[in-house]
């Protein structure tokens, strides 16, 4: 069998949000029995069929890089972590739906990975300084995933999901909310599975079919500009 082409997707978010459990579920379609803290970075692989069911279908390796640590780490730690950000093709931003702080920190995680967390003055950009325009021209595909959906009380679910919808909109990304202990949330044919497949297709298209991806990106940007004008 010929070697498969591959893409690199970072999985970023605060410690304890369930990144390792999510990656295990994505790669093995199984619940991770005994999750532990990730030190440094852990890499797992998912096999993905690009444009499945079409004449263009082709199989790729999706490398999922689960990066550990805290977004508020010292500069020396962040510099070490920056090694993992080289040659990235996509980013999955993971937050705990029961922890609002983990959602807010996604702004800082994304800016750090995209080398935009430091202003020309050297001052750290906080999520309070976040400007949606910073991502308007971002060409790295993003996906926002909220975990621990099962732990949100029914009385608060609408409030939480409304807030996370705005979060995904800020990143110009689709969102998936799930419980990592229940594989049915990513069952084949489900809306979540479709979103996930669409995200991986975007990552592959950006990496291996850039001209096609660029035309779609520019069309999408033009559409957003027209919506803002009206």
Curated annotation (Swiss-Prot):
SUPFAM superfamilies: P-loop containing nucleoside triphosphate hydrolases (SSF52540). GO terms for molecular function: GTP binding; GTPase activity; protein homodimerization activity. Belongs to the small GTPase superfamily. Rab family. SMART domains: RAB. Keywords: GTP-binding, Nucleotide-binding. Required for KRAS signaling regulation and modulation of cell proliferation. Regulator of KRAS prenylation, and probably prenylation of other small GTPases. Required for lymphocyte development and function. Not required for myeloid cell development. GTP binds at residues 16-21, 148-150, 179-180. Residues 1-230 are annotated as: Small GTPase-like. This is Rab-like protein 3. Homodimer. One of its GO terms (biological process) is B cell differentiation. One of its GO terms (cellular component) is endomembrane system. InterPro entries: P-loop_NTPase, Sigma_54_int_dom_ATP-bd_1. The keyword Nucleotide-binding applies. Gene3D superfamilies: P-loop containing nucleotide triphosphate hydrolases. It holds the Pfam family Roc. The keyword GTP-binding applies.
């Amino acid at each position: 069998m010929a070697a498969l082409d591959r893409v690199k997707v970072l999985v970023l978010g605060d410690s304890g949000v369930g990144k390792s459990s999510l990656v295990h579920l994505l790669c093995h379609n199984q619940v991770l029995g005994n999750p532990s803290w990730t030190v440094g970075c852990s890499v797992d692989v998912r096999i993905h069929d690009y444009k499945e069911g079409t004449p263009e279908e082709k199989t790729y390796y999706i490398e999922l890089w689960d990066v550990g640590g805290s977004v508020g780490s010292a500069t020396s730690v962040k510099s070490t972590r920056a090694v993992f950000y080289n040659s990235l093709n996509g980013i999955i931003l993971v937050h705990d739906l029961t922890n609002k702080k983990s959602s807010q920190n996604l702004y800082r995680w994304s800016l750090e990975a995209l080398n935009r967390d430091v202003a020309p003055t050297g001052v750290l950009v906080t999520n309070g300084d976040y400007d949606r325009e910073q991502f308007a021209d971002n060409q790295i595909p993003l996906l926002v995933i909220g975990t621990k959906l099962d732990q949100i009380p029914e009385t608060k679910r609408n409030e939480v999901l409304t807030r996370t919808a705005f979060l995904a909109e800020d990143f110009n990304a689709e969102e998936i909310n799930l419980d990592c202990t229940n594989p049915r949330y990513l069952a084949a044919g489900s809306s979540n599975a479709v979103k996930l497949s669409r995200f991986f297709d975007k990552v592959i298209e950006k990496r291996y079919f850039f001209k096609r991806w660029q035309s779609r990106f520019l069309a999408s940007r033009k559409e957003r500009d027209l919506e803002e004008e009206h």
